Amino acid sequence: MSAKLIKGTEIREEILKEIEAEVKEIKEKHGKVPGLVTILVGESPASISYVTLKIQTAHRVGFKEVQDSQPVDISEADLLALIDKYNKDDSIHGILVQLPLPKHIDEKKVLNAIDPDKDVDGFHPVNVGRLMIGGSEVKFPPCTPAGIQEMIVRAGVETSGAEVVVVGRSNIVGKPIANMMLQKGPGANATVTVVHTRTKNMDEHCKRADILIVAAGVPGLVKPEWIKPGACVIDVGVNRVGEKPSAKDPNKMVAILSGDVDFDAAKEIAGSITPVPGGVGPMTITMLMLNTLKSLKFKLGLI
């Protein structure tokens, strides 16, 4: 029997509708809307595409959206001054700097210059510390881990007391989702194991998992025999493994994407599983919108 598909595309639509409704209500009662600025340095096609998607989504849910494009040769000092301007702008509640930045700019210095109360990506050291403490201290959880947790909750997967195995220890996904699953609350209270490139007998750890979260960036790393029957499998990996003609235009080639899990085989064993694409990916920008809305609500004293 095939596993239940946990589709990020469907959950995204549910959440965006909820955000849009709440934005309208806050605007009617308080005369304010969330403001999100995305700072883009240079003209990388991939970065432009991603920023455009963020701006379009912000517009859709009723935010004030600002795309601030800067030349690739902007100085570090000028970029820091720009961030300081938005830190002081009361109409802006979320500040994003699209990465990567040019080599002459210190990314760490730039990201740390963002006001932690406007750091809706959740990567400022202050917000990382808040996440570690947990509970009411958490303001802005990192977007991809937050999306994973939201998918698990909305799919009705029991986490309390569950064995969770996280494959990967990155600061962006692995470490934060492991910490979030340990916390008290919905989508948490789990017993968590993190495995990585130096882990011995990785497959034996994975076989214990009631919930297996894979964020290694290695296509097909997790084999079907690693999966516990009935487990929930969250595949965070998005790997380009080739090209194929586009269905819309056969003369145009598009990427073939693969996750970190052997999906076709795994779906015959797992109880539920995320597809690639269409699984975790759509949730990242969605949770970015939710964090920006939360920033305004913090400002208004609504939470």
Swiss-Prot record:
The catalysed reaction is: (6R)-5,10-methylene-5,6,7,8-tetrahydrofolate + NADP(+) = (6R)-5,10-methenyltetrahydrofolate + NADPH; (6R)-5,10-methenyltetrahydrofolate + H2O = (6R)-10-formyltetrahydrofolate + H(+)
Gene Ontology BP term (one) = tetrahydrofolate interconversion
The EC number(s) given in the record are 1.5.1.5, 3.5.4.9
For this protein, the record's SUPFAM superfamilies field holds: Aminoacid dehydrogenase-like, N-terminal domain, NAD(P)-binding Rossmann-fold domains
Among InterPro entries, the record links this protein to: Aminoacid_DH-like_N_sf, NAD(P)-bd_dom_sf, THF_DH/CycHdrlase, THF_DH/CycHdrlase_cat_dom, THF_DH/CycHdrlase_CS, THF_DH/CycHdrlase_NAD-bd_dom
Q: Which PANTHER family match?
A: C-1-TETRAHYDROFOLATE SYNTHASE, CYTOPLASMIC, C-1-TETRAHYDROFOLATE SYNTHASE, CYTOPLASMIC-RELATED
Similarity section: Belongs to the tetrahydrofolate dehydrogenase/cyclohydrolase family.
- Name the record gives this protein: Bifunctional protein FolD
In its UniProt entry, the species of origin is given as: Desulfosudis oleivorans (strain DSM 6200 / JCM 39069 / Hxd3)
Gene that this sequence comes from: folD
